[in-house]
Amino acid sequence: MKLIPVIDLKDGIVVHAKFGHRDDYQPLQSVLSNQPDIYSILNGFLRMHAFDTLYIADLNAITRSGNNTALIHQVLNDFPSITFWIDAGKILPQEFPKNYIPILGSEYIDKHCATYLAQFNHEFILSLDHGVVGERLGATELWREPNYWPKEVIIMTLARVGSSQGVASKELQHFNEAHPNKQFIAAGGVRNMNDIDILKKYNVKAVLLASAFHLGAITAENLKF
């Protein structure tokens, strides 16, 4: 299974995403670095393991309160061998850097989802987002029509992000059984390697995680596989 570290950016610094309450996110405290800047955290991840994929959430762009675009593009330029999955809110199709894969989240995709997603020609990763009380966010049509989905789909449970409450295993099992031709990615709630083993049983292809790394619950030793 592929483990993908997550970096949440707000106002130019890395913050600790927790429970989906974005207004309350605080500067990150991590065993990987004593500074909450993106380069320190990213290099902390790379000291752990030679990750080839990282996820960056631009929280300012997602909440329409500015953006961290220049900083993110500088990071992509400085680490050309790493693929970055970027969630920058509702974006328009454009020419992205070669190591940039856009994440399109259901929370900001409305009833015109077919027209919007078609513009990307399946060159994106979809995030099916569950809200802070577990509700499905975004257009109902998007959740019901897998033909709109690309090959890779994130099952994002915002209420579990940063919570150390464990993964939404039943939801992931449902999606894997209902849509065996898709590759599902777990996001939210991973506590330790035991949760990773649970996800493997459900044939989850990858997992996004941050807190387990920053708390030292998953270490470099665990990643020697």
What are the language-model segments listed below?
Residues 3-9, 54-56, 82-88, 100-104, ...:
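Hydrophobic faces of well-ordered beta-strands that scaffold small-molecule active sites
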Residues 7-29, 96-162:
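Conserved anion-binding
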Residues 21-43:
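Short catalytic helix/loop segments, enriched in acidic residues and glycine
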Residues 45-98:
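N-terminal active-site wall of soluble small-molecule enzyme domains
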Residues 67-73, 137-144, 165-174, 223-225:
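Charged helix-capping and loop-helix junction motifs
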Residues 145-185:
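Active-site/ligand-binding-proximal alpha/beta "capping" segment
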